[in-house]
Amino acid sequence: MRLGKLSAFALAALLAQGAAAAAGGARGAAGGARRQGAAAVYRLDAARSKFVIRAFAGGPLWFKGHDHLVAASEFTGEARLTPGSVSPASLTLAVRAASLAETREVFTVEQKKIINGELRDAVLEADKYPEITFRSTDVSVEPAGGDLFRIKLGGDLTLRGVTRHTVIPVEVTLRGGELRARGEFDIKRSDFKVPATAAFHGTVRVRDRLKVSFDIVARRT
């Protein structure tokens, strides 16, 4: 809801470097034009990235239930930025909703099949809403020393057909042509009209708060 293109988060680190370089000295008009010319493109490496959502057990008999840890296996991301600018040209993420699946070993294989079926069909309605997307609208960058940057990324998160503005704190490391972004944030299930799963005649149900975490690797193309 892996919420999970996420490689975009990492790009803000490069924006910070570009802004610092621009502030460091005057540039001629021709040089400025060259800086604003070609956009740098980074694409998410899904095989090396992780995007998970934790749902917590609640209700009067919450102690009889288990938390859920749902991971996405299919997601794509791309970020484009203009060197020397503090605003990327585009920053997007798309997660295939049907790829989200329970990962906790506390559940049996058969239980996971039931959970995943309910998640896909009733909770996310993946056939009707096949993608969960994030599109950036604003970003602020704070260098944290060395190749580490702390970023606040604002954008539109669309889940189950509902779009909400969401601010995500991210720690980004930039080394060579590779960007790595890590972070976590909370969303409310009710904000996106996501129904709660329940057991024991409704005495155990998923809480409203969901925690989204990610560890994203992206490479410059």
Which ranges hold each PLM region?
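Low-complexity, acidic/polar, glycine-enriched regions of mature
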Residues: 21-221
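Bacterial N-terminal signal peptides
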Residues: 7-17
